[in-house]
Regions:
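Short coil-to-helix segment of the ABC ATPase nucleotide-binding domain corresponding to the Q-loop/switch region
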Residues: 98-105
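Conserved signature/switch motifs of ABC ATPase nucleotide-binding domains
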Residues: 137-140, 158
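Conserved ABC ATPase "signature" region
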Residues: 105, 109, 116-134, 186
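Helix-to-loop junction immediately C-terminal to a conserved catalytic motif
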Residues: 59
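The feature captures the beta-strand-to-loop junction immediately N-terminal to the Walker
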Residues: 44-46
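Hydrophobic anchor residue at the start of the ABC signature
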Residues: 152
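Conserved ABC transporter NBD signature motif
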Residues: 67-77, 121
Length: 263
């Protein structure tokens, strides 16, 4: 399987089955997906549909049991070893005894970069998420939204072109979430990174994305891929426009079509 230089993630007929004491669990089935350089791609679907599992396969945190997957033309394992991506988890996962600056530099210490390079990258990443001035603060001194921005800065410090984000704003209230959505969109526009983003929120998926991947209940399959054409400098006001509502309606209809209410 060969990948174009503009293809960042290339998935073909990929499946994943977990073996358990109660028998096999079919998590993903026959997934085909291409993510191109500079795209913001959201995965949306019901709980348990495999959104996070798919992201973890891309990150080499889970191994596919069938099909093919390439990240920048190499295997997920090689991409992980090459540090080709940054990963933002659902919770900030900041170490409480380390300052924000030292939380951001932690993976860079593991990479054995020089102190000067670690600090340069950390300060640059914190500036991108508008946390410059908070370098010496500790996680408990920051709000939940600010902690998640610090987590994003840590992922950005790798200076990788691919950013993987697993429901990073899911635990935040709606107003804070809206603010961080706008900040993330500005960050994407400035850096032109490729983003794969897991969410349960239809408005969030539509607002952020250039491509929306709608998934079915387990076993997770892709039932629709919706491309948007909104301006990169869009604001939250776009959510009231007919164009936005039309895309949101298509996402909702895709989720309804793939959902079972037999439980």
């Amino acid at each position: 399987m060969a990948a174009s230089k503009d293809v960042v993630v290339d998935i073909q007929k990929m499946s994943l089955t977990f073996q358990t004491a109660d028998g096999p669990v079919y998590a993903l089935s026959e997934v085909d997906l291409t993510i191109n350089k500079g795209e913001f791609v959201s995965f949306i679907g019901p709980s348990g549909c495999g959104k996070t599992t798919l992201l973890r396969v891309i990150a080499d945190l889970e191994r596919a049991t069938g099909g093919d997957i390439l990240i920048n033309g190499v295997s997920p394992q090689q991409a992980r070893e090459d540090r080709s991506y940054g990963y933002v988890f659902q919770a900030p996962a900041l170490l409480p005894w380390r300052s924000i600056e030292r939380n951001v530099t932690l993976p860079l210490e593991i990479m054995e970069l020089s102190k000067e390079e670690r600090l340069r990258r950390a300060h640059e990443a914190l500036k991108l998420v508008e946390l410059n001035g908070f370098e010496k603060k500790f996680p408990w001194q920051l709000s939940g939204g600010m902690q998640q921005r610090a987590s994003i800065a840590r992922a950005l410090s790798f200076d990788a072109d691919l950013l993987l984000m697993d429901e990073p704003f899911g635990a935040l209230d709606e107003i804070v979430r809206d603010h961080l959505n706008e900040q993330l969109l500005k960050l994407w526009a400035r850096t032109n990174k490729t983003v794969a983003f897991v969410t349960h929120s239809i408005p969030e998926a539509v607002f952020l994305s250039s491509k929306i991947v709608v998934m079915s209940p387990r076993p997770g399959r892709i039932i629709d891929v919706i491309e948007t054409d909104f301006a990169k400098d869009r604001t939250l006001d776009i959510r009231e426009t007919p164009e936005f509502l039309e895309v949101a309606h298509r996402v909702r209809e895709g989720l309804r079509a793939g959902h079972s209410y037999d439980d």
